[in-house]
């Protein structure tokens, strides 16, 4: 019986470190997606016409906040980053606080809500990126990526980071749900093995 408790404590410590690593990766992915998209801006000057031989120039700026889907993308990724930062802080600095009962259920629910939030934001931004890249002939929306290549490249990088965050949050959410079945599987990283029954 004592050997099984030690084995369970060792497994618990390993699963805690894996979950902490996954949360750190998800935090990094979602934060980088929010920062890259939030700073995404490109300004170019184009010739829009001619008066005689004199070209008429106009300056246009492509910014993330010109599209509501990209604003939603930045806000959602920032919220998921903040959630993961709080969970990391609780796991590292939580002392001997056990995640059981309502606390465990609330963490699992928050993880599932964050998966939904970041998935919706990434898909909305991916749709708008597709319109920006290829346009929409039926709606007569012109593509812009042939004119604002850097803007589109930065947006693509943010989307890649966000979809990596979606995958990581799915794994974290599955781990949170599995902890509902085995509540003492992962407590704080600083908790002693004697906490595990």
Curated annotation (Swiss-Prot):
The modification N-acetylalanine is found at residue 2. It comes from the Eukaryota. The keyword Membrane applies. InterPro entries: CASP/CASPL (IPR006459), CASP_dom (IPR006702), CASPL (IPR044173). Residues 2-17, 91-106, 178-197 are cytoplasmic. The chain crosses the membrane at residues 18-38, 70-90, 107-127, 157-177. Keywords: Acetylation, Cell membrane, Membrane, Transmembrane, Transmembrane helix. Belongs to the Casparian strip membrane proteins (CASP) family. Signal peptide: none annotated. Its main location: membrane. One of its GO terms (cellular component) is plasma membrane. Homodimer and heterodimers. This is CASP-like protein 1B1. Residues 39-69, 128-156 are extracellular. It is found in: Cell membrane. It holds the Pfam family CASP_dom. It is a multi-pass membrane protein.
């Amino acid at each position: 019986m004592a050997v099984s408790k030690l084995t369970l404590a060792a497994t618990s410590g390993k699963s805690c470190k894996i979950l902490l690593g996954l949360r750190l990766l998800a935090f990094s992915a979602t934060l980088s997606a929010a920062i890259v998209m939030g700073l995404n801006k490109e300004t170019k000057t184009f010739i829009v016409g001619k008066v005689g031989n004199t070209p008429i120039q106009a300056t246009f700026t492509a910014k993330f906040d010109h599209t509501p889907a990209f604003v939603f993308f930045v806000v959602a990724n920032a919220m998921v980053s903040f959630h993961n930062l709080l969970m990391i802080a609780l796991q590292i600095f939580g002392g001997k606080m056990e995640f059981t009962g309502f606390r465990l259920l609330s963490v699992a629910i928050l993880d599932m809500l964050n998966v939904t939030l970041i998935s919706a934001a990434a898909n909305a931004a991916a749709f708008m990126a597709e319109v920006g890249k290829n346009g929409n002939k039926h709606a007569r929306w012109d593509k812009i990526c042939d004119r604002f290549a850097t803007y589109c490249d930065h947006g693509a990088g943010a989307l890649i980071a966000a979809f990596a965050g979606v995958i990581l949050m799915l794994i974290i959410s599955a781990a949170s749900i599995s902890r509902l079945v085995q509540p003492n599987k992962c407590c704080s990283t600083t908790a002693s093995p004697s906490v595990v029954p």
